[in-house]
Structure formats: C-alpha cells, structure tokens
Amino acid sequence: MPPRQLRIGTRASQLALWQANWVKSELEKRYPAMEVTLTKIKTMGDRILDVPLAQVGGKGLFVKEIEEAMLRGEIDIAVHSMKDVPTEFPEGLGLYCITEREDPRDAVVSRAARFSHLPPGARVGTSALRRQAQLLHARPDLEMVTIRGNVETRIRKLDEENLDAVILAAAGLKRLGLTQRVAEYLDVEFSIPAIGQGALGIECRLSDPVVTEAIAFFNHPDTSHAVRAERALLRRCQGGCQVPIAAHGTIRGGELRLVGLIAAVDGREFVRDEISGPVDQCEHLGEELADRLLSRGGRAILEEVYQREI
C-alpha cells in the first residue's frame, strides 16, 4: 500500500526542479491518490558560487543539506543528479533507485561548428576538472575558464565573459529543452563522462519499507549496474565529485564494459583503461579497473591533486 503523501526534497535550480517534477509526475501517474509535494533546499554548492568547486573541498556539496532534512523527517525522498552523489551515505540513508540514463555525453555550446574548429588559444568555460583535463589533453592550446552557476547562467557566460565555448552535460540541456544551443556532442570515448552522468538517483530512509516499495519502479537495472560500477571505481580511488576521475559503463547482452580515466588537471598525465565482465560483477569490475588505473600512475596524479596521500 503506497503512502498517502510523499515529500520530495530537491535543490532549487531549474534543472533540479525539472528532475524532481518528473519524479513527482511519474509517482502521480502510478498512484493517482497520492499527494506529492516538493521541498526546495539550498545546499552549500548552491550558496558558494564565487569559488571553483574543487577549492570548496569536501564531498556532498549538493546533497548534504537535503540529507539532513531527510534525517530530521522533513522529507521522504530526495532526487539527485547521480554525478553529484557521494559514494558514502549518512547512517540510515541510501540510494534506492537509479533511473534510466539520459544522454551521458558532454556537449559543446559555442559559436564554432565543432570542438575541433575552435581557434588556437580559445577560451573554454567548464566547472569540471574531469572535462578540463580531457580537453587539454586533446588541445593543450586551450585556455580553460572556471565557470559556476546553473545551466542558463553558464550559457549566458559564453557572451558575458567573452568565451569561445562552454562544455555542459548533454542530459541537462535536453531536459531543459536547450538542445538548439548545442554545436556538438562529444563522443564518450573522447570525453569520458562524470561518474553517473545522465542518471538520476532517488535517496530515502532505508528503514521505511512503505516508501521504498512505492519508488522501486524507478530503478532501471542496466543503468543501475553501469552506475554502480562507475561509483565503485570512484570509491576505490577515494575520489569526490570534483576530481579529474571519469568512468562510463555500458551493458550489452549481460556484459558490462567499463572505461575509466585518471588525469592531471593540465591533461599532460593521462591514465586510461577499460575492463569487461559479467554485469552481476559490476562493483568488482569497477574496483579492479580502479586498481589498474592507480597502479599505472593514477595514484601519483591524485596525490598531486589532493596534495596529500590517498
């Protein structure tokens, strides 16, 4: 028997609200008698906009305050972009569902027709060290400019800050109906996505069977297995959301292929590898690939990034 009321916690950005409203709509379609409400919560990542995320430090910059509201009993579930979700959870909370992945690619918003057409020394805006490292590896001549803010703000900075391009997640642009601004989608082999990019995660109190049963239908098995492998790699590397680590899993015929990357921020040092195996071994495969990357130079790269031993 589903609950009569379900309270969803979400960030207040336009993209976060789109995601939460999509979950709300799906719940209302499945349970017409259920009252579903949204609670907007401002996180530390939303409040600190004048500092690059990598310098803010800590994990869970976009989820901590939402989890605290759940622990206080103010909300029942939280909807997150999977790429923002830490690999560890407060006691009693957990990720119960991972939704079917939207387009996992990075997208170029620019005046040029393609990334390869950007002029020498072009100014490219991004908030992610992962993107910065991979793009500089391909084009060392580029000037990377750190930009913060929601999707619309970042696109606006293309003009306001005299940038030649900004790089954003394709999933967010598609969800917000902004695909007309995309000059090119970057192949996942060229720009490996962030861990969990394109998927949504639904977090809840694991001790609440009424809620967990009501939301179980959101889970997409193939996406869940792929993202669990990506997150196992990240966890093994002891990485947060703002480190130059990338991974992308795909599943065909019960077989998981996982590509992973650890790179120096300037793109000069670059360790990439891949692994394949049975989908039911997804987390083991992620850990094994992480060990390979770390042993082939990734550990030294991360030590320099963190300025401490991992």
Curated annotation (Swiss-Prot):
GO CC, alphabetical: cytoplasm
Cofactor mode of binding and number, as noted: Binds 1 dipyrromethane group covalently.
Q: Which InterPro entries match?
A: HemC (IPR000860), Porphobilin_deaminase_cofac_BS (IPR022419), Porphobilin_deaminase_N (IPR022417), Porphobilinogen_deaminase_C (IPR022418), Porphobilinogen_deaminase_C_sf (IPR036803)
Residues modified as S-(dipyrrolylmethanemethyl)cysteine are: 241
**Associated pathway:** Porphyrin-containing compound metabolism; protoporphyrin-IX biosynthesis; coproporphyrinogen-III from 5-aminolevulinate: step 2/4
Keyword list, A-Z: Porphyrin biosynthesis, Transferase
E.C. number(s) listed in UniProt:
2.5.1.61
Alphabetical list of HAMAP family matching this protein = Porphobil_deam (MF_00260)
Please describe the quaternary structure of this protein: Monomer.
Tell me which family the UniProt entry assigns to this protein: Belongs to the HMBS family.
Give additional notes from the record: The porphobilinogen subunits are added to the dipyrromethane group.
**What's the protein here called?**
Porphobilinogen deaminase
